[in-house]
Design a protein with these regions (language model features):
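Basic, helix-initiating cap at the start of DNA-binding domains
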Residues: 1-31, 48-51
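Actinobacteria-biased recognition of intrinsically disordered, low-complexity terminal regions
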Residues: 1-12, 158-162, 169-181
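Short hydrophobic clusters on alpha-helical segments that form packing/core surfaces
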Residues: 7-15, 61, 65, 86, ...
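Amphipathic C-terminal alpha-helical segment
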Residues: 88-96, 125-127, 140-159, 170-179
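Amphipathic alpha-helical packing segments from all-alpha helical-bundle domains
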Residues: 62, 81, 105-140
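Short hydrophobic/aromatic patch on the recognition helix
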Residues: 32-43
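Alpha-helical DNA-contacting segments of helix-turn-helix folds
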Residues: 50-57, 61
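Hydrophobic alpha-helical connector segments
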Residues: 52, 66-91, 139
Length: 181
């Protein structure tokens, strides 16, 4: 476990400094102070390492979002606050924001991660109690929307919040009355 965390920490530092696409397994082995054999014992290949990194960081962001939104009772406000905080947390993290410097890589990582999808669906289930299938469908769409905001940001946080209020909040609840003002 310690090797895995050390490797993922080193990968994050490299992603932030060089960009995700520029980092290979030998770079990560060297930066983490482990042999390539140890690296490959922990991760079958670069795709597996990247997925593990995304999943670990997604859990960290999800835990932080749970703390930041726990006291918000209004589902609409919890949704909007959760999304705006998620965007901020990713943007403020150099290793995470590096994923979205190459738009295809970040969007692909987010959209293909079962962990990101499951955590987003769980967040949505907590808003309106929809069934898991509906929440998962909405989560797939919401992850794409978030990837869009991360790759093509609005002019400022207020503009993004306005777009979320106008377009996302009414749709994500599945019924405009669920999350409408």
């Amino acid at each position: 476990m310690a090797d895995t965390e050390r490797i993922l920490d080193a990968a994050g530092e490299l992603f932030a400094s060089r960009g995700v696409a520029a980092v290979d397994m030998s770079d990560i082995a060297r930066a983490s102070g482990c042999s390539r054999a140890t690296l490959y014992r922990c991760f079958d290949n670069r795709a597996a390492l990247r997925a593990a990194y995304v999943h670990r960081e997604a859990r960290t962001v999800a835990n932080r979002l749970a703390e930041l939104t726990a006291a918000i009772e209004d589902p609409r406000e919890r949704l909007l606050t959760g999304i705006t905080h998620a965007l901020r947390l990713v943007r403020e993290s150099p290793p995470l924001s590096a994923w979205f410097a190459d738009t295809a890589m970040g969007a692909q990582a987010a959209a293909s991660s079962d962990v990101v999808l499951a955590m987003t669906a769980s967040f949505l289930l907590g808003l309106d109690g929809a069934d898991r299938e509906a929440a998962t469908r909405r989560a797939r769409w919401l992850v794409r929307v978030l990837a869009s905001f991360l790759t093509v940001p609005g002019r400022d946080a207020d503009e993004e919040r306005s777009m979320l209020e106008e377009f996302v909040a009414p749709l994500i609840g599945g019924r405009t009355t669920t999350l409408a003002r």
